[in-house]
């Protein structure tokens, strides 16, 4: 049973403050105070490494899906050598079910900017890029405006806030490729190349953008940093689940009465998110299934959700992941064959084609699922689909093949009766 007190939580990422996207309003509500602190309060922050240590202690786990400790990632950057090094901020959210970063771009862009500036200072980085999906044209324009305002106020540029630290900040628009959300593919795109993932090692911290050390963080991840600097690591660790602390931006979509983005602590019960926060299943229907963290996270049946909370440890017990916390809710009338085909169609369309198991595997998955969907499938096709997923997973440069395989494997295994009934109906009608 969850002990997280989510009902009394006060938002810090998207608080209810009018016009918070404007720099003057942001400043009046404590904005950029954390940046001023790390630059000027030398007793508290004697050097950049002290900032890294505080963020590492807070255990801000990446909000882009992997869940890696952000401060630990920062610590992998080698010592500064006077040559360029980069921070690349990943705002290329393109996975079905995920739409939370755009809330920050729209509503509280300066929080993200401040977090990125603190991160850059902590790693002695002088150039920041934020990569935003091309379809987010309105949010790209908003970020351009916010960054220019920060330049005008002296938060970005030469010797910011009278310190000896200088930094530049650029917005880079994507061109509609989901694969560029993969960190090394994003680096290729930033360099003006086709978005092909790179073989690792070397990892970006050793050889990243233009061959120089680079750290890549998700937009929401960086947006947590100012509050950690202001309030301390222990404050952050006191919010939500013990091993996956802090608030999340939950993007809830599908068959609920109140879809949207909600900021709440990690560790909130899945059923509370659906029935209390999002207003329950629309039209009085029953809950059938939930994809908890974006389309790559394994689907869960309604009967698996009792006592399950939105954090890595809890979801792992039922064979799923928190991912990006982009929850897709499905009611009793949902056709799971159609859902799975649509997901597989997406991954086939978005595969870059560099690796054979992914290029060919995603195509076969979509083709066979379309056959079943159209009423021409056989029961043996289900085992063929499962076999194909085993030939894809762990055999490619990046994790897109895994992301395509997991939904197929788990949806078939958890809704096998529904798939078999469709296949048997096909055979019966053919006879």
Predicted regions located by residue number:
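Conserved phosphate/anionic-ligand binding catalytic regions in large, soluble enzymes, centered on
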Residues: 56-77, 174-188, 192-193, 348-360, ...
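Ferredoxin-type iron-sulfur electron-transfer modules in oxidoreductases and energy-metabolism complexes
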Residues: 33-55, 83-85, 91, 100-105, ...
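Short amphipathic, charge-patterned alpha-helical segments
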Residues: 115-119, 266-282
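Gly-rich Lys/Arg/Thr-decorated short loops/hinges at beta-loop-alpha junctions or inter-strand turns
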Residues: 26-33, 89-101, 204-210, 251-256
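Cofactor-/ligand-binding subdomain signature composed of acidic, glycine-rich
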Residues: 1-52
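Histidine-anchored nucleotide/phosphate-binding helix
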Residues: 108-122
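Hydrophobic alpha-helical positions that pack around
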Residues: 5, 140-266, 278
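Short acidic, glycine/serine/threonine-rich loops at helix termini
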Residues: 66, 71-74, 98-101, 140-145, ...
């Amino acid at each position: 049973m969850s002990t997280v007190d989510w009902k009394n939580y006060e938002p810090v990422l998207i608080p209810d403050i009018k016009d918070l996207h404007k720099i003057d309003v942001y400043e009046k509500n404590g904005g950029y105070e954390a940046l001023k602190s790390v630059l000027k309060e030398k007793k508290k922050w004697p050097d950049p490494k002290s900032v890294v240590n505080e963020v590492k202690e807070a255990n801000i786990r990446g909000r882009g899906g992997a869940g890696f400790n952000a401060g630990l990632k920062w610590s992998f950057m080698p010592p500064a050598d006077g040559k360029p090094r980069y921070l690349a901020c990943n705002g290329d959210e393109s996975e079905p079910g995920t739409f939370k970063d755009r809330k920050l771009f729209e509503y509280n862009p300066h929080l993200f900017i401040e977090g990125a500036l603190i991160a850059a200072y902590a790693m002695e980085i002088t150039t920041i890029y934020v990569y935003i999906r091309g379809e987010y044209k309105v949010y790209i324009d908003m970020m351009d405006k916010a960054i220019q305002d920060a330049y005008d106020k002296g938060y970005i540029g030469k010797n910011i806030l009278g310190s000896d630290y200088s930094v530049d900040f650029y917005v880079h628009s994507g061109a509609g490729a989901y694969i560029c959300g993969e960190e090394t593919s994003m680096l290729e795109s930033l360099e003006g190349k086709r978005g092909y993932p790179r073989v690792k090692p070397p990892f970006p911290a050793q050889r990243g953008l233009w061959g120089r050390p680079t750290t890549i963080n998700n937009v929401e991840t960086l947006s947590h940093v100012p509050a950690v600097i202001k309030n301390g690591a222990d404050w952050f660790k006191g919010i939500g689940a013990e091993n996956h602390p802090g608030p999340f931006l939950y993007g809830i979509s599908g068959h609920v009465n109140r879809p949207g983005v909600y900021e709440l602590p990690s560790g909130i019960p899945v059923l509370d998110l659906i029935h209390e926060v999002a207003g329950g299943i629309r039209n009085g229907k029953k809950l059938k299934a939930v994809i908890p963290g974006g389309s790559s996270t394994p689907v869960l049946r309604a009967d698996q959700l009792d006592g399950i909370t939105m954090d890595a440890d809890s979801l792992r017990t039922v064979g799923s992941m928190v991912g990006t916390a982009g929850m897709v809710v499905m009611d009793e009338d949902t056709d799971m064959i159609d859902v799975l085909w649509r997901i597989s169609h997406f991954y086939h369309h978005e595969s870059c084609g560099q690796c054979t198991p992914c290029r060919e595997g995603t195509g076969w998955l979509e083709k066979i699922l379309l056959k079943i969907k159209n009423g021409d499938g056989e029961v043996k096709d289900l085992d063929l689909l499962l076999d194909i997923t085993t030939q894809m997973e762990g055999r490619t440069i990046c994790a897109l093949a895994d992301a395509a395989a997991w939904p197929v494997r788990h949806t078939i295994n958890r809704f096998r009766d529904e798939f078999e009934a469709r296949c048997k109906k096909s055979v019966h009608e053919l006879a």
